[in-house]
Regions:
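Central regulatory/effector-binding core of bacterial HTH transcription factors
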Residues: 20-85
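Short helix-loop hinge/linker segments at domain boundaries
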Residues: 3-26, 44-45, 90-93
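Flexible hinge/capping segments at coil-to-helix
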Residues: 89-101, 105-127, 214
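Secondary-structure junction motif
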Residues: 35-36, 87, 124-149
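Ligand-binding cleft/hinge of the Venus flytrap
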Residues: 39-48, 69, 137-153
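Alpha-to-beta junction loops
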Residues: 68-80, 101, 167-176
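Extended ligand-binding regions for polar small-molecule ligands
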Residues: 2, 120-123, 200-226
Length: 226
């Protein structure tokens, strides 16, 4: 099993023969791949033999888990946050960057006009975030805010999906979010917060990747994060 970026790069370097091939990227509203495509725009200059194909899939938990279980079949990889216990041990991961956690809210929310938020801005607000134990990047948020900022009301959710974003439009609640979801809903806005919380973002792919996919990971890995 190839789990770490360095191992992927070492394996990909062993590939000597270049040929034209297609990498199929799964996309949905919650997994738009915009960050990957920005990075690939730079790498593609050096790898003109690689073609990308966008494969849409439904934004539901069953559909997402089916994609994970069949990576390498109709879809080669996803570009999204990763390392969550909710998905289980279904895939390999290639780290691209750590994204700062932000806050999303309705454009009618009193905080929506701010360019950035302080923790004091969140006082007496309700912040939605993944339940404890679902992933390693929201647990520190729970720990710090509960112990040091009890004025912020925390509310756990089992899954962040498009339905939750839709509910947020008519709610006064806030949602823990990130740059990769900036454009998920046109009636929501996403605002940076004065804290240091981040989440890992990268590519998830089959446990048995093809040589072509390894070559693609090498190409993306050679480009500095955008």
């Amino acid at each position: 099993m190839i789990r770490h970026s360095k191992t992927v790069l070492q394996k990909a370097h062993e590939l000597e023969q270049k040929k034209n091939y297609t990498i199929r990227i799964g996309v949905s509203l919650m997994n738009p791949a915009a960050i990957l495509l920005k990075q690939w725009k730079q790498a593609s200059i050096l790898y003109p033999d690689v073609r990308l194909e966008i494969v849409p899939f439904e934004d539901t938990v069953p559909a997402f888990l089916e994609v994970l279980d069949n990576l390498g079949s109709k879809i080669d990889l996803l570009s999204c946050p990763y390392d969550t216990k909710h998905w289980g041990d279904r895939y390999n991961s290639f780290h691209l960057m750590d994204l700062p956690l932000k806050v999303s809210c309705s454009k009618s929310h009193p905080l929506a006009e701010k360019d950035h938020l302080t923790l004091e801005d969140l006082y007496e607000q309700t912040l939605l975030l993944a339940n404890r134990g679902l992933n390693p990047y929201t647990d520190p948020v729970w720990n710090e805010l509960e112990s040091m900022y009890p004025q912020i009301h925390l509310k756990g959710v089992d899954y962040v999906d498009i339905h939750l974003f839709n509910q947020l439009v008519t709610s006064q609640e806030l949602l823990l979010s990130a740059e990769c979801w900036d454009s998920v809903h046109p009636l929501l806005t996403t605002i940076p917060v004065d804290w240091s919380f981040t989440m890992p973002y990268g590519l998830i792919y089959s446990k048995n990747p093809s040589p072509e996919l390894l070559q693609f990971l090498l190409a993306v890995g050679q480009v500095e994060s955008v």
